[in-house]
Regions:
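Short glycine/serine/threonine-rich phosphate/pyrophosphate-binding segments
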Residues: 25-29, 110-114, 135-137, 159-162
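Adenosine-phosphate binding glycine-rich loop
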Residues: 120-188
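Rossmann-fold NAD(P) dinucleotide-binding segment
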Residues: 87-101, 109-126
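Glycine-rich phosphate/diphosphate-binding loop of Rossmann-like nucleotide-binding domains
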Residues: 1-98
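General beta-strand structural signal in soluble alpha/beta enzymes
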Residues: 42-45, 87-89, 103-104, 128-130, ...
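Structural motif
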Residues: 16, 39-42, 100-101, 125-127, ...
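Short amphipathic alpha-helical segments and helix-helix/interface helices
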Residues: 30, 76, 115-119, 139-143
């Protein structure tokens, strides 16, 4: 995301993100966004989606999500109940208008044509695929045709994961242990 924003002479500071999923990838997005001055204001699970206008930016909220998904990974409603946020049952957050970036981070083929049309109509500029192939081919082609949007496909976005795997192999062979900051520095 940062590289896409940099290419567009933009920054992550103050950006509002909508994501699907709150597993390892989604939770990592929430944490990294908060560290960089952005915030996840919408996140979806199998039971619906949560709208937290303040964002998932505190350790309390991030830790609660870890606990919540460990107890019951199929329901994100407990987050809304605990923090007094809006919960929309049985729906996805694709199409909400008060975000800057959409990031599907849950599962393959999560975003189909109907959702892609809602995303495009929302006026959002950035669509960043984080899960492996989260968008159906027809929906991805449709989004890429939108002149107002920057679309980053999963194969490009996830290249860092392959790089980190290589770094892990190097660490293991040399019996080293790098901090998250050191891994980030190695990637850049």
């Amino acid at each position: 995301l940062q590289e896409v924003l940099k290419h567009e002479n933009d920054t992550i500071e103050g950006k509002r993100l909508a994501i699907s999923g709150y597993g390892n990838v989604g939770w990592g997005i929430m944490k990294k966004a908060a560290m960089l001055g952005a915030k996840v204001t919408y996140f979806a699970g199998p039971d619906g989606y949560v709208h937290d206008p303040d964002g998932v930016i505190t350790d309390e909220k991030l830790n609660f999500i870890l606990e919540m998904r460990a107890k019951d990974p199929m329901h994100c409603k407990p987050y809304a109940d605990k923090f007094g946020c809006e919960f929309v049952p049985g729906a996805k957050c694709w199409g909400v208008k008060d975000v800057d970036v959409y990031m599907p981070a849950a599962t393959q083929n999560d975003v189909k044509m109907e959702s892609a049309e809602k995303i495009a109509a929302s006026g959002v500029k950035y669509y960043i695929e984080v899960a492996n192939m989260p968008t159906t081919n027809d929906a991805l082609n449709y989004l890429r045709e939108q002149k107002h949007m920057i679309v980053a496909p999963s194969k490009a976005v996830n290249a860092g994961g392959v790089g980190v795997s290589g770094l892990e192999m190097s660490q293991n062979s040399e019996r080293l242990s790098w901090s998250a900051e050191e891994v980030d520095a190695q990637l850049h």
